[in-house]
Each structure stands twice: as C-alpha cells, then as structure tokens.
Swiss-Prot record:
Gene: HRI1
Organism: Saccharomyces cerevisiae (strain ATCC 204508 / S288c) (Baker's yeast)
Function: Unknown. Non essential.
One term under GO cellular component: nucleus
Family named by the database record: Belongs to the HRI1 family.
Protein name: Protein HRI1
Highest taxon above the source species: Eukaryota
Length: 244
C-alpha cells in the first residue's frame, strides 16, 4: 500500500535535530521520493534550500522483511542531489538502512554512510518517521489502529521519458511530490522540485516550488491510465503506475 511519512528527527552523532519539513512518498508499487527543504534556510542555504532530496523507482531499492516489524532497505538512488551537485564528502553507491516499527506507529530508520570513501570510516545516522494519512488535507497521524486510511489512497507515478531529463512524480492520496533534473548539468540550475496538496475545494496548493523549469512537471493527474503519456510544456511523461 502507499505511504506518506513525515520525518520527526534526524540524528548524526549525539545531538538529534530537525531543521526540515521532510516528507517521503512511497507508492503502492515501491517507487519513492523524499524532499527535505529547510524550514528556516540561512546563508548559503538560501540558494538551494534543501538538506537533501532523493528519488528512485522500485528497481533502485531492495527491501527484505526481517520479521518482528523490522525491514531492511538497500537504496541505489536514481536522483541523489548530493551526487548530482558533486558535493564534497558525499557517499556514493548503495545505502543500507534498517527500519523498525514502534508500538506507537512511528518508524525508526538507522544506517551508515561512507562520505570519505568505502574503505574509510563510516558515519552512522538515525531518523524517526511518522506515517500520516495521505487522503487527508491536514497532517493526520496514522496509528496501527487506522492504517486503512492510507491503504485506500490513490497511488499514481509518472516518469519523464525525454533524453535530456530525468524526472519522477509520485501522487499519494492528496499529496504530490516530484523532481525534474537536467542531465549533464550538475548545478542547482538543473534541479526542479514540487510539493502539491489537493485541497477539499478541489484546487491544488503549492507547498514547495523550486527551479526554473517546474512548469515542465505535470500538475494535473485526472483521466490517466498506466502506460499513457502526459505532456507538460513540451516534455513527455509516462504513467508507470496507476492505482485510483
């Protein structure tokens, strides 16, 4: 079933913190995107106000159920903004993570990255996630007792098919997140992100819009079917998943 997760905590070292409004979308078929914009960017962050963003299709993640509410997930991201921008001391290659369900309904993610090289010292991290109901306009907590709400949410995924771009849009219930990146650019000028919320009125509200080419990202998701093509300002997107 699809999932929408809000991050509550991020920890590297002894001091936990959370400076972002991070939402991760996971489709029914396992495609995913995580956008992590700063709440109060400052200084150099103003030009690119994101801690990080990544995305991928289900071909870029391997998930294994370990039992007792524990799942391992190994990612080879399609988009990794740190890699795209050639940020110094960036982990490259597969990221191994472990996800543990808490009785409260929260999900703890732990793992380690190797920013200085695979043969160098690792850096451990910890994140805490709260599942929210994607069929609601407000951020309503999903507990173990009401997961039926999220299981009934629509799950639609579009992927760009143009040779000059990579792109993915994931619609989970009312919540939409997407990215579009220019191939072979590797600067912030080549990155575009959206986060949309469909309101009770039927209109969509931009919660996040970044980049000079966001108008090439589809922003209407009616009358679609799997395998169909959507054109947005000259850019073709294929519907690779449709559950509604």
């Amino acid at each position: 079933m699809p999932a929408l997760l809000k991050r509550l905590l991020f920890q590297v070292g002894p001091h936990p913190n959370e400076r972002t409004f991070t939402l991760s979308s996971v489709s029914t078929d396992g495609h995913y995107i995580s956008l992590r914009p700063f709440v109060k960017p400052s200084g150099d962050e103003l030009s690119f106000p994101f801690e990080w963003a990544f995305a991928g299709t289900n071909e870029t993640v391997k998930a294994n159920d370990q039992g007792n509410g524990v799942v391992t997930q190994d990612f080879n991201f399609w988009l990794d903004t740190n890699v795209y921008l050639n940020v110094p001391n960036t982990h490259r290659g597969e990221v191994n993570t472990t996800w543990k369900n808490w009785d409260s309904g929260c999900v703890e993610e732990t793992g380690a990255v190797y920013p200085f090289g695979a043969d160098k010292e690792s850096v451990s991290f910890r994140e805490l996630w709260q599942p929210v109901d994607p069929s609601r306009e407000d951020l309503v907590i999903v507990s173990p007792n009401n997961e039926k709400f999220s299981s009934n949410a629509r799950s639609i995924v579009l992927k760009v098919t143009d040779e000059a771009y990579d792109g993915l849009v994931i619609v989970i219930g009312r919540w939409i997140q997407g990215f579009l990146s220019q191939k072979n650019n590797n600067t912030i000028e080549g990155l575009n992100f959206i986060r949309l919320l469909e309101k009770d009125s039927g209109k969509s509200e931009f919660l996040l819009s970044y980049g000079k080419e966001v108008n090439k990202i589809p922003q209407s998701y009616e009358n679609l079917k799997k395998g169909s093509t959507v054109t947005s300002n000259g850019l073709n997107w294929e519907v690779i998943e449709y559950h509604a």
